[in-house]
Amino acid sequence: MTNSNRIKLTWISFLSYALTGALVIVTGMVMGNIADYFNLPVSSMSNTFTFLNAGILISIFLNAWLMEIVPLKTQLRFGFLLMVLAVAGLMFSHSLALFSTAMFILGVVSGITMSIGTFLITQMYEGRQRGSRLLFTDSFFSMAGMIFPMIAAFLLARSIEWYWVYACIGLVYVAIFILTFGCEFPALGKRAPKTDAPVEKEKWGIGVLFLSVAALCYILGQLGFISWVPEYAKGLGMSLNDAGTLVSNFWMSYMVGMWAFSFILRFFDLQRILTVLAGLAAILMYVFNTGTPAHMAWSILALGFFSSAIYTTIITLGSQQTKVPSPKLVNFVLTCGTIGTMLTFVVTGPIVEHSGPQAALLTANGLYAVVFVMCFLLGFVSRHRQHNTLTSH
């Protein structure tokens, strides 16, 4: 593979995470405006975003097999067409059914693109380099989470319709579409280069179960937390701009943390540092949830920084549970994380309706505690140490 081709594929991976980050994170900012647009209460409107999350889940789950049937380049180009149709549907329709359909399509496109992005990184890089590359790739999720709430706040404050936020997000996919030209993708399935060595099937082990539960609880906790921070902050008397700044600060700190940990992680055992970070994140979220508005800005910055490496380290450890990284295993852990995304409003919507936004934030805190327990238990069964020893010889 040429260096320029590797760079293009790496940038497609970066932007695939930015696309998903923008679509998922901007929800909390635009939800109130979309609820007004359709004359629905916010708690009811949040349920329609489950279509976005369901699209992401289904596409990541199916793409473990689709990648071997449909070429990756074809998937990305077809995704561009679907993206245009979905954004057009949001802009020109006043129907809630069409809105839900467009959200589902956006989810499908986002899930396919992100699973391709993750696969490309695990395919091109090995060992600890894979972990740091995945972490840097995931930082684009956070970068989008910092930039797009600011864009949304800017547009909404000037009474520009909410659907223009999604048009701006569509520009990320335009960049992915352009990068597919003159770029060679790894061949999979029947098109993959044949080798004489027999393919050895490995059992995944119980460590994959612990990692999958951790991925689900982490994403459900994170998105359950960040989706309701704006409503919680407004309930404490903050303006929409200040609430948006809290969300942007979280993702800015998350992004900086990812860049820092992409270097720091090289010097530590992944399972041990993951356990420490999960414990710290649970404590810091509790400080935010029970603290005063004066301390919220600092606690959310600290939470963003120390939780930044958790999800990517879970995926990296998942890929290291077998000698040869398996696309199906990586996609399985990703799928569990995406189930967390899909359940975000299914779980938190009724909690907010009955007990208010702070109850949703405390629920998220409990989920972070579960992540800590899973990471601690992983220490007794993880295979990543023996596989790292084998690859280093």
Curated annotation (Swiss-Prot):
PROSITE patterns: MFS. Keywords: Cell inner membrane, Cell membrane, Membrane, Transmembrane, Transmembrane helix. GO terms for cellular component: plasma membrane. Pfam families: MFS_1. Gene3D superfamilies: MFS general substrate transporter like domains. The gene is tsgA. This is Protein TsgA. The keyword Cell membrane applies. It is found in: Cell inner membrane. It comes from Shigella flexneri serotype 5b (strain 8401).
